[in-house]
């Protein structure tokens, strides 16, 4: 019995947890069971276990501190500590098995796995070179090709387009000006237009180098051969086959015509009309005559909601304005005229309009008929002074005649101008006359 117990004790691993190898601890489902030890302590415990074990007779070098900072030493440590279980596995898999996915390792491509990425910056002079100055398959070479792919290429055939003394920066400016001109030209016509490149020539004049600019017009064949524009830009600029087959001089003339928009002489005919209800306006007690908005605000200060007054507008394009109290404030609204109708917004057909001003004021007396943005004219502010006899006579005369009928009255011209003061003009027609051709 004693011998059997001794033989069983030899077969059973009775070593403490800390002295076991990691392969024995992995049976629990966790890589490092027990206490969480540092890398140095783990390597020491693993090395002790390996020396005790009769299967693995290799010696472990005493360089555990250097193994923490080197990926190759970590791989060697994992191979010695874990035995034949990790043979044939990559470094990433071994680290994942060892750490237990506590620290996820970022996927790296083969391009970046050669070493740590370089922190060196690419100089602008290196980007101007035609060939990559960096070693192939390096990080700097990858960045150099990436930047070159996402920037505008410089065509080797650019000598046909620009002069030989043009610098690289001036060439890029010319390309930007070319695209800007194409956008401006495309606004005037739906047909395609051949693009033009604006180049700068160095001159020895007073303005210094780069002051003169020449517009070189290229044919479609040279555009197709050169790689300055992408295929999409060529398709959008050259959609018409007839346009491509035209001679160069015809294309040049059409470009010059499209660059200068057509000019027209516009003649607008107006009809002048007197205010239709000037007499009723003058008899209305809410009409205060000539008054600016500051005087109106002083009169309306402290008045209840809906109090209003009618006055002459301070702007020449409008005849009358209303000042009213709403939302505890003094507000102002101009009365506009369009097609012999008066409203507070002549360009909106949904806003109420009336053929006379008195009818417009009557409509906005009802609060239920007023929108929140429209004036509320429920309580008129009574005028406290009478008008002059001259003004009253003018309203009576204008009520009996028309604007053209005033010219037939046997009165002085100064009085005719005084009678025509309250009038508006309505647009009748618009005539567009072509501009005469300019002869050089």
UniProtKB/Swiss-Prot annotation:
Alphabetical list of CDD domains matching this protein: SH2_SOCS4, SOCS_SOCS4
Pathway in which this enzyme or protein is active: Protein modification; protein ubiquitination
Alphabetized PROSITE patterns for the sequence: SH2, SOCS
Domain of life the protein comes from: Eukaryota
Listed SMART domains: SH2, SOCS, SOCS_box
Keywords, in A-Z order: Growth regulation, SH2 domain, Signal transduction inhibitor, Ubl conjugation pathway
Domain (SH2) ranges: 286-381
Domain SOCS box: residue ranges: 376-425
S-S pairs: none
Biased composition (Polar residues): 1-11
Record's keyword annotation contains Cell cycle: no
GO biological process, one term: protein ubiquitination
Region (Disordered): 1-29
Composition bias type Basic and acidic residues, residue spans: 12-29
Free-text comment on this protein's domains from its UniProt entry: The SOCS box domain mediates the interaction with the Elongin BC complex, an adapter module in different E3 ubiquitin ligase complexes.
Function: SOCS family proteins form part of a classical negative feedback system that regulates cytokine signal transduction. Substrate-recognition component of a SCF-like ECS (Elongin BC-CUL2/5-SOCS-box protein) E3 ubiquitin-protein ligase complex which mediates the ubiquitination and subsequent proteasomal degradation of target proteins. Inhibits EGF signaling by mediating the degradation of the Tyr-phosphorylated EGF receptor/EGFR.
Name of the molecule in the record: Suppressor of cytokine signaling 4
Gene: SOCS4
